[in-house]
Structures are given as structure tokens and as C-alpha cells.
Amino acid sequence: MIGRIAGTLIEKNPPHLLVDCHGVGYEIDVPMSTFYNLPATGEKVALLTQQIVREDAHLLYGFGTAAERETFRQLIKISGIGARIALAVLSGMSVAELAQAVTLQEAGRLTRIPGIGKKTAERLLLELKGKLGADLGTVPGGPAVSDDAVDVLNALLALGYSDKEAAQAIKQVPAGTGVSEGIKLALKALSKG
């Protein structure tokens, strides 16, 4: 397995790259989040990679962060989700945004990505639950979600509310609200239905 490639960036044409590593040119596909952070052609580049061996091809996918690569690995484990769709997901949203969408069960955020329909989005939410560090606030480099929001969510779950109900109620709690006040506001939102 090829886990990392470092060399000179020879070509970049979204989402494809050609990286020269000691005279060997590696074709690598990357998500747009990685593509936008690449240096200019002719510069040195280092990418974490995932190699996929198929009957008709050996394919390399490159990532700027370990979190992106791990998320890609989780995505391609899902039945019906291939590397092309996994790259589309990572191109359409950050790892942190995906983790939040999974935690809050927001299929609508996923359906905005080309190639992801309602059924595929629902399958992604189901299969990724608990596999991305998807608890609120646990994805490094993403938008911070306070520990208080996580505590409020956990309290609602402990009270017997479903993940979806709790996630919807959390959206009604303003950022920076303390735990006890957050629970009160979330319960009020749940009682309104």
C-alpha cells in the first residue's frame, strides 16, 4: 500500500494531479478541499494517500489531512458509495461539516452535493453515525461546537429523546448558552413540537 507520496507537483487539473517522485509520475485524484490548498506546479508537495486496487486499475487518492483520508476510508466502506462519490462528499463539505451533518441527521446538507440523492444521503447518515468522531465538537480543524452543546445533546438523549429530536432541539439553542439554560430551551422547543 502507498500511504504517502512526497515529490514535485507536475500537473494539476481538478481533481487530478501528477506528482513526480524520484522520476516516477503518480496520478492522484484529490478532493477539492485538498486541491485548493496545493502549492503551484513545480513546487514540492506531500499527500497522504489511499490506494485502491481494482481488476482493471490501481488508483491513488490523495488528502491534505489524516482526517480527510480517514473519512474517505469510512465513506468507501458503505455499500453503493465508491471513490467518486466519496471524493464528491469531501469536495462538497469539510470533514467537520460532514460530522455535524451526521450528528444532527441533516440529509438536506448532503443532498446539495452533486451525485447524492435523498436515499444515498439517508444511507450515509445511518452508516456514518458514530464512525467519524461525529459527536459534536470532536473533529479537529472544524467549526467549534461548545462542550455545553454536547452536554445538552447528551442530556436530551438520556431523557429518552431520539437522536433526530435532540439534534433538532439543539438548533434552537443559541451559541454560548450554558448547559442548564440550554436544556430548558431545548425542552421548550421539543414541547412546541
Swiss-Prot record:
* UniProt entry keywords in alphabetical sequence: Cytoplasm, DNA damage, DNA recombination, DNA repair, DNA-binding
Domain III: region residues: 151-193
Q: Does the keyword ATP-binding apply?
A: no
- The ranges of region (Domain I) come to 1-64
- Does the record bear DNA-binding in its keywords? yes
Q: How does it assemble?
A: Homotetramer. Forms an RuvA(8)-RuvB(12)-Holliday junction (HJ) complex. HJ DNA is sandwiched between 2 RuvA tetramers; dsDNA enters through RuvA and exits via RuvB. An RuvB hexamer assembles on each DNA strand where it exits the tetramer. Each RuvB hexamer is contacted by two RuvA subunits (via domain III) on 2 adjacent RuvB subunits; this complex drives branch migration. In the full resolvosome a probable DNA-RuvA(4)-RuvB(12)-RuvC(2) complex forms which resolves the HJ.
Per its UniProt record, what NCBIfam families does this chain match?
Answer: ruvA
Give the UniProt family note: Belongs to the RuvA family.
Its recorded name reads Holliday junction branch migration complex subunit RuvA
Identify the species of origin. Ralstonia nicotianae (strain ATCC BAA-1114 / GMI1000) (Ralstonia solanacearum)
Gene name, Swiss-Prot/TrEMBL: ruvA
